[in-house]
């Protein structure tokens, strides 16, 4: 690699997520690049767009709302809950069940968002392949035009020009 962080937007010199807390520290703007004369394309999504967002059709938690949307914090919450002893403690067992149920919904929502981003990346890759093919077609056309200009059969060109000039002179005399 080049030593730069992915998912950090334009802040590629530092880690996008805090390893201890899961907080996003990357840039807010995704990296864009010009891919054609009149087309700029997002070439890298931020970690915030991928791991801290949900889709518009996300499932709500049983009590309403969406709760935590940061995938890492959702997983940390589930892990911490599973580490809590619940033996002979019905209240702790109920609380753990609720945390795990909420985590399942949160992970499903996060996974749907990740799949949406993956689909977006696939669409952009498809567009880049089409732009590449279009560029190859243009290059071939320009090579043919250049060949037509450079590889002229001068005898044929002069003969054709002379015949066209004679036809033009004849049309002038007809009027």
Predicted regions, residues:
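Amphipathic alpha-helical polymerization modules
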Residues: 1-12, 80-175
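Amphipathic alpha-helical coiled-coil/heptad-repeat segments
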Residues: 1-63
């Amino acid at each position: 690699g080049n030593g730069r962080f992915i998912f950090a937007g334009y802040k590629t010199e530092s880690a996008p997520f805090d390893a201890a807390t899961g907080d996003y520290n990357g840039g807010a703007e995704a990296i864009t690049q010009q891919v054609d004369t009149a087309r700029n394309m997002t070439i890298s999504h931020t970690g915030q767009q991928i791991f801290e967002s949900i889709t518009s059709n996300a499932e709500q938690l049983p009590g309403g709302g969406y709760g935590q949307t940061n995938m890492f914090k959702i997983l940390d919450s589930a892990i911490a809950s599973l580490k809590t002893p619940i033996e002979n403690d019905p209240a702790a067992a109920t609380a753990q069940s609720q945390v795990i149920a909420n985590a399942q919904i949160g992970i499903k929502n996060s996974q749907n968002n990740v799949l949406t981003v993956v689909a977006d990346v696939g669409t952009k890759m498809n567009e880049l392949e089409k732009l590449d093919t279009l560029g190859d077609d243009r290059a071939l056309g320009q090579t043919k035009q250049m060949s037509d200009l450079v590889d002229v059969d001068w005898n044929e060109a002069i003969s054709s020009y002379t015949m066209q000039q004679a036809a033009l002179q004849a049309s002038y005399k007809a009027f």
